Amino acid sequence: MTTKYIFVTGGVVSSLGKGIAAASLAAILEARGLDVTIMKLDPYINVDPGTMSPTQHGEVFVTEDGAETDLDLGHYERFIRTKMTRRNNFTTGRIYADVLRKERRGDYLGATIQVIPHITNAIKERVIAGAEGHQVAIVEVGGTVGDIESLPFLEAIRQLAAEVGRNNAMFMHLTLVPYLAAAGEVKTKPTQHSVKELLSIGIQPDVLICRSDRAIPAVERAKIALFCNVPERAVISMKDVDSIYKIPALLKSQNLDSYFTERFGLECKEADLAEWEQVIYEEANPTAEVTIGMVGKYVSLPDAYKSVNEALKHGGLKTRLSVNIKYIDSQDIETRGAELLEGLDAILVPGGFGERGVEGKIQAAQYARENKIPYLGICLGMQVAMIEFARNVAGMEGAHSSEFKKDCAYPVVGLITEWVDDEGNIETRTEKSDLGGTMRLGSQLCHLVEGSKVRQMYGSPTIYERHRHRYEVNNKLLPQIEAAGLKVTGLSADKKLVEIIEIPDHPWFVAAQFHPEFTSTPRDGHALFAGFVKAAGEYQKRNLK
């Protein structure tokens, strides 16, 4: 089987939505029965985004096999059924690290190491490896054409297209077509210059995706086709829409999928987008709206919680409720008090690192517990719920996490020094371990306690969920905490690590050490988020009565 490659680039400005466009195209091709995967090539020099600031880069998406990757991989998994792995995302830093490691070993036999051919060859090898076994591989190159950082990647995909043959490779370029109100028309010149820049690198785009706040008139599309040397049918108008899940239908309505399959000579059925039509219908026809407060420390950039945001929306789709997310900085709770939490139908405390804002999160957990408001804690959100309960219910004054206070009286949360991974291997860590790539990462087995809320929601005695943490509940202090009324309802594969806690005498108080948001999709939703949003709706109804 010969893999067909679609290389996706962007021009004029950043943040045009290359990831969404790539994922939407993949969704249509998948609906035609093709086996599709998507890769993201990131031009920054960090080895991976694992230690990057969420307020600069957005969330870190964790794959099943434990890779810390770009948030675009979350979009990919939400749009197609193929699961992403560490092969689906790599950076300039990763490539250079690998090449330099080989150079130190002497693998290059004393050759002078250069961007061409050594770096570009390494990029091509990774792209080919990531595409292996799939009929179509969509490869998104991060950054904007013209940036110095992305040049090695652009050169690599130019070479790869030539090597596999142009009947097996196509280039899709996203550009901005701005509307000038003063002139009353859209302007095509930025697109022309962007394509000119791409041509100077040796790449002729086969398809142009023109981003605008409105549909681009046929006459302007014809003009773009003429000046940029592409067929008119390959100039696609991608206007702003109120839901990203409408993009597959928007692209299909312009026969983008057919253009690719015809060029590649692929014989496949017509795309059936019934599942996406159902998603759009559910999104457009909620029965009510609930307001969920997200108490975090990275709320200045909502993309820091991208998968959580989407998972809440998916929970709303499955319960026919519109979810209004109210972002609350946990530091504001520390300074202004818990009145910031008034009027909410539910409270969610997501993951995070570092001491800043932790006391505000603890106050949020306390407010939810005392006022019987539905609460979902994720990762650190579970740990702060544990600390709050230990302090205020179990009588453990001064309880804290050793991450924030090493000499606290009751370290109810501590560093995981040893655990068994899903393959039965023993992993060990110390406080001196590097920060990057040393956490408990990836999909792990979890045993659910019979009779618990989570067992009822999942409908299964065991589940697999993805993790990203290096601190865990201290089992030595569990008996005193459980005696006070909190229950552990989920345990790790070896039943030594706490994965889920619940408060049985609370209408809905659930917290998990794992990250359920990474496995939520618009078509299937997720049991925890559907249960949480449903609980928010029930709380709202009780209050209205």
Swiss-Prot record:
Annotated ranges, domain Glutamine amidotransferase type-1: 291-542
EC numbers: 6.3.4.2
Keyword Acetylation recorded: no
GO annotation terms (biological process): 'de novo' CTP biosynthetic process; pyrimidine nucleobase biosynthetic process
Enzyme class: ligase
Subunit structure: Homotetramer.
Note: CTPSs have evolved a hybrid strategy for distinguishing between UTP and CTP. The overlapping regions of the product feedback inhibitory and substrate sites recognize a common feature in both compounds, the triphosphate moiety. To differentiate isosteric substrate and product pyrimidine rings, an additional pocket far from the expected kinase/ligase catalytic site, specifically recognizes the cytosine and ribose portions of the product inhibitor.
Name the UniProt record assigns to this protein: CTP synthase
Lineage, highest ranks first: Bacteria, Pseudomonadati, Pseudomonadota, Gammaproteobacteria, Aeromonadales
